[in-house]
From Swiss-Prot:
Family to which the UniProt record says this protein belongs: Belongs to the phosphofructokinase type A (PFKA) family. ATP-dependent PFK group I subfamily. Prokaryotic clade 'B1' sub-subfamily.
Stated name of the protein: ATP-dependent 6-phosphofructokinase
Residues engaged in binding ATP: G12, R73, F74, G103, D104, G105, S106
Reactions performed catalytically: beta-D-fructose 6-phosphate + ATP = beta-D-fructose 1,6-bisphosphate + ADP + H(+)
Membrane-spanning intervals of the chain: none
Residues annotated as binding Mg(2+): D104
GO molecular-function terms, A-Z: 6-phosphofructokinase activity; AMP binding; ATP binding; fructose-6-phosphate binding; identical protein binding; metal ion binding; monosaccharide binding
EC number(s) recorded for this UniProt protein: 2.7.1.11
């Protein structure tokens, strides 16, 4: 029977992680469990930086961005010997299970711990919305608000100067954040990792817009597709229109979480406790069709793929 659990945040931070930690702690305490926080993710787990949390440890945390437990990249966790030390640090404190909040890399760590006999539950915490087994991840909607606000501001100055603006959005190899922000921000063009990109095709579309009398434009593009500064130079050369690139960067990860992220994080945190008390381990939590669900974490990592919603992209193109 589970009596003590740990909770950590790992990988890139996202708004709502604190709300998720709070959900785990408050729900766990209400069920009579002891809850321990691990500082700086898997690195802190390896270094034995573990502390007991009470309900006051998470007071006034639901509205704060980032993660008060901290997060760190720790590639050495791939090594079995490193994980064995981490498990030893948990077992000597009497911990029975671990809740991991993070993206697919964090899930991989939880998967490996589970395979070594230590039960874990994963919660999807990333602005990229690229985790399998869930429609939305914790932090996605807050990041979306941040990106849309930036696009709105860029449109003001682009309109004033009759300029083309390129805005680079996070997402790694998932275009969800870019596509949603482009629709909400009224961007004229979208460049996504799921769709083959040729700069000359984009220039053709921009020229077509100019021919119709378009005096400015916003191009939303997901990171890692190309060098946006070089793309801006190419567009300016080919169209004769002043073109500027803006990389939003890590500002997208910060800020007070919006209401939906707070609710999603709180419900997922509490649900992880329910699953552990029911004897589940090696699961990851998600929300699908507005319902909380859970999947085998190994299956989620190895077999489940997030579907690309091409129908939304096609609809978006009709709105430009």
């Amino acid at each position: 029977m589970i009596k003590k659990i740990g909770v950590l945040t790992s990988g890139g931070d996202s708004p709502g992680m604190n709300a998720a930690i709070r959900g785990v702690v408050r729900a766990g305490l209400s069920e009579g469990l002891e809850v321990y926080g691990i500082y700086d993710g898997y690195l802190g787990l390896f270094q034995d930086r573990i502390a007991k949390l009470d309900r006051y440890s998470v007071s006034d945390m639901i509205n704060r961005g980032g993660t008060f437990l901290g997060s760190a990249r720790f590639p050495e966790f791939r090594e079995e010997g490193t994980r064995a030390i981490a498990i030893e640090n948990m077992t000597k404190r009497g911990l029975d299970a671990l809740v991991v909040i993070g993206g697919d890399g964090s899930y991989m760590g939880a998967k490996r711990l589970t395979e070594m006999g230590f039960p874990c539950i994963g919660l999807p915490g990333t602005i990229d919305n690229d985790v399998a087994g869930t429609d939305y991840t914790i932090g996605y909607f807050t990041a979306l608000e941040t990106v849309v606000e930036a696009i709105d501001r860029l449109r003001d100055t682009s309109t004033s100067h009759q300029r083309i603006s390129i805005v680079e959005v996070m997402g790694r190899y998932c275009g969800d954040l870019t596509m949603a922000a482009a629709i909400a921000g009224g961007c004229e063009f979208i460049v996504l990792p799921e769709v083959e990109f040729k700069p000359e095709d984009l220039v053709y579309e921009i020229k077509a817009g100019i021919a119709k009398g378009k005096k400015h434009a916003i191009v939303a593009i997901t990171e890692y597709i190309c060098n946006v500064a070089e793309l801006a130079q190419y567009i300016e050369k080919e169209t004769g229109r002043e073109t500027r690139a803006t990389v939003l960067g890590h500002i997208q990860r910060g800020g007070r979480p919006v209401a939906y992220d707070r609710i999603l994080a709180s419900l997922m945190g509490a649900y992880s406790i329910e699953l552990l008390l029911q004897g589940y381990g090696g699961r990851c939590v998600g929300v699908q069709n507005e319902r909380l669900v859970h999947h085998d974490i190994v299956d989620a990592i190895e077999n489940m793929k997030r579907p690309f919603r091409s129908n939304i992209l096609e609809t978006a193109k009709k709105l430009f």
